[in-house]
C-alpha cells in the first residue's frame, strides 16, 4: 500500500541535506520557544521538514552541548567498559559521555572498535591455525627422521632467527597506512584491562 499525502502541504516536505538557513531557523526557533512537540515545531518555525527530521537535526548536530571532535582515549575506554557491561544500549552509554550522542557512539563502535576486534579475531584464528600446522609439520618431520637419525631439528623460534632486519624496505606511506590498520599500545592495554589481565 502506497502512502499518499493527505493534503497539499505534506507534499512540500523537504528531504535531503539541511541548509545553513534551515539550521539557523531551527536554532533561533528553539532559542525563542524551546523544544516542544516536534511536528508542530516544524510547522510553526516555517520549516518544510518533518518533526522527526527537526528533532534528529537538533539532538545530533545543533544542540549547543553536542561535543565536536574525535573521541578521546578516555572516552574510548569508557565506551568499551560500558559496552562490555550493557551491550548495544547506545542511549544508556551516551548518558555517561556528556555531549556525545547515542548515534555518534554507535557509529564510533561499529567503524573503529568492532572493526579492530574482528581483525584481531581473524589474526588470532590465522595464528592459531598456523601454529597448529607448524606443530604438525615438526612432529611429522621428527617422525620421518626416526629416533636414530642424527640430524638436528631446525624448527623456527623467534630467538633462533638470524636474518638481517636492516633489509626491510617500506614505502613512503607505510606508517600512515599501518596506523589505520593496527592497534596502538593504548588499545591493547585497554583491551587487557577489560579482560582482567
From Swiss-Prot:
Keywords for this protein: Activator, DNA-binding, Flowering, Nucleus, Repeat, Transcription, Transcription regulation
Record-level GO BP terms: circadian rhythm; floral organ senescence; green leaf volatile biosynthetic process; regulation of cell wall organization or biogenesis; regulation of DNA-templated transcription; regulation of flower development; regulation of gene expression; regulation of phenylpropanoid metabolic process
A Pfam family matched in the record: Myb_DNA-binding
Any GO CC annotation of this UniProt entry: plant-type cell wall
Compositionally biased tracts (Polar residues): 138-158
Chain positions covered by the region annotation Disordered: 125-158
Transmembrane portions of the chain: none
Induction comment: Circadian-regulation with peak levels occurring in the early morning hours and lowest levels during the late afternoon hours in flowers.
HTH myb-type domain: residues covered: 10-62, 63-117
UniProt xrefs under Gene3D superfamilies: Homeodomain-like
Compartments, record wording: Nucleus
Expression across tissues: Specifically expressed in flowers, mostly in stigmas, petal tubes and petal limbs, and, to a lower extent, in anthers and stamen. Also present at low levels in roots, stems, leaves and sepals.
InterPro entries (alphabetical): EOBI/EOBII-like_plant (IPR044676), Homeodomain-like_sf (IPR009057), Myb_dom (IPR017930), SANT/Myb (IPR001005)
GO molecular function terms noted in the UniProt entry: DNA-binding transcription factor activity; sequence-specific DNA binding; transcription cis-regulatory region binding
Disruption phenotype: Impaired expression of ODO1, EOBI and several biosynthetic floral scent-related genes (e.g. IGS, PAL2 and CFAT) leading to reduced scent production in flowers (e.g. phenylpropanoid volatiles including benzaldehyde, phenylethyl alcohol, benzylbenzoate and isoeugenol). Impaired anthesis enter and premature senescence of flowers. Altered cell wall modifier transcript levels in flowers.
SUPFAM superfamilies reported for this sequence: Homeodomain-like
DNA-binding residue intervals: 38-62, 90-113
General function of this protein: MYB-type transcription factor controlling the production of volatile organic compounds (VOCs), including floral volatile benzenoids and phenylpropanoids (FVBP), in flowers of fragrant cultivars (e.g. cv. Mitchell and cv. V26) by regulating the expression of ODO1 and EOBI, key regulators of the shikimate pathway, and of several biosynthetic floral scent-related genes including IGS, PAL2 and CFAT. This scent, mostly produced in the evening and night by the petals, attracts the pollinators (e.g. the night-active hawkmoth pollinator Manduca sexta).
Name this protein carries in UniProt: MYB-like transcription factor EOBII
Native source species: Petunia hybrida
Gene: EOBII
